[in-house]
Design a protein with these regions (language model features):
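N-terminal twin-arginine translocation
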Residues: 1-5, 16-33
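Active-site acidic/histidine proton-transfer and metal-coordination neighborhood
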Residues: 10-14, 18-23, 61, 95-108, ...
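Acidic (Asp/Glu)-rich catalytic clusters
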Residues: 33-35, 60-66, 84-104, 133-140, ...
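Boundary/entry segment of secreted carbohydrate-active catalytic domains
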Residues: 33-55
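Hydrophobic faces of well-ordered beta-strands that scaffold small-molecule active sites
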Residues: 36-42, 70-74, 103-108, 144-146, ...
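Short, acidic/polar
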Residues: 50-65, 124-133, 235-243
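Acidic/histidine-rich catalytic cores of soluble enzymes
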Residues: 71-72, 170-172, 176-276
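Glycine-rich, proline-tolerant flexible connector loops at the mouths of alpha/beta enzymes
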Residues: 73-92, 151-154
């Protein structure tokens, strides 16, 4: 039974005890009758923000007024020097609240490597993230998103060799150590620490799942990204396998998009297949639009991604 048909059945039939038994049977075979909600990741507008055409403080207004979205995911690089500026954070929060927009998380980059093999550098990286945990709490977010790749100098390159840092298992231990300490700090104020597949071994779903198991804390989790599965150079991990491996730990999901065909489908990712993986894992939270393409301008790319997600949702 399609999830949408399940919802109709659930809302129109309420009278008999026999039906409640039928519903229990259906529910056991339908992992997520609530489907999902859509949010906007600020990186979707990175060129527009970097050009100064819009200001970070107007991000929530764009999400709500231009796209009808009521939840956002911030990127720390767009207010990097404001993490401890209470007046600025207060203005961010007020603007979101006035618009009825939920602040979901802060994506954090350029604060050091949580899995750095140098213990002093690793500790420094952990502590560098504390201010973002505090900022997330102030803004009403549930999480900060961090990276589990081991050296930021290698992240995103085509030539960096992650195998020179240590064994596969050793890199699990290093990343888990930094993540565990940061997660324990966040736990003191109710903030999750979630990891995105974002290059290097973090784009290996099996490896990142092993890191989650090693940390073994209710406040640690993943942010599966549909597209970030390039490990290094031309070495890619299967995106569907990767998302499936990361979904058991997911506290957010990123719908990465680059380009679309004439039917409005993303050409790199089968959104129907991917969203079924997401929903079959029991996930019913926000799925964040993260448009990274160049053929469409950012506003059009965001709208195309939103339209596709809604089309997929209507088909389920």
């Amino acid at each position: 039974m399609k999830r949408r048909n399940f919802l109709k059945l659930a809302t129109t039939s309420t009278t008999t005890l026999a039906f409640s038994g039928v519903m229990s049977s259906i529910l056991s075979g339908c992992s997520n009758p609530k489907l999902f909600k859509i949010s906007l990741a600020e990186w979707s507008l990175h060129r527009t923000l970097q050009s100064g055409k819009i200001n970070h403080l107007d991000f929530c207004k764009v999400a709500k007024n231009d796209f009808g979205l009521d939840a956002v995911e911030y990127v720390n690089s767009f207010f990097f020097d404001k993490a401890q500026d209470q007046s600025y954070l207060k203005e961010m929060k007020q603007r979101a609240d006035d618009l009825g927009v939920k602040s979901l998380l802060i994506m954090c980059d350029n604060e050091g490597s949580l899995g750095d093999p140098d213990p002093i550098a690793r500790t420094k990286a952990v502590e560098n993230h504390y201010k973002w945990v505090d900022a997330a709490k102030f803004l009403g977010c549930h999480s900060i998103r961090v990276n589990a790749y081991l050296t930021e100098s290698l992240h995103g390159t085509s030539t960096g060799n992650y195998n020179t840092i240590g064994s596969y298992e050793n890199q699990i231990n290093l990343a888990a150590d930094g993540l565990r300490r940061l997660t324990e700090f966040g736990d003191t104020i109710g903030i999750n620490t979630i990891v995105e597949n974002h290059g290097g071994l973090s784009s290996n779903g099996q490896w990142l799942a092993a890191v989650m198991e090693k940390v073994d804390h209710p406040r640690v989790g993943t942010l599966p990204d549909f597209g970030n599965f390039r490990i290094q150079g031309e070495e890619w991990y299967d995106r569907y396998k990767g998302v499936e491996e990361l979904m058991p730990y997911a506290k957010a999901v990123s719908a990465k998009s680059h380009d679309f065909d004439s039917q409005g489908n993303e050409i790199n990712t089968d959104y129907y297949k991917m969203m079924n993986i997401v929903l079959d894992a029991g996930y019913s939270g926000y799925v964040g639009i993260e448009y990274e393409g160049s053929k469409l301008d950012e506003m059009a790319g965001i709208q195309a991604t939103k339209d596709l997600l809604e089309k997929v949702k209507d088909s389920l």
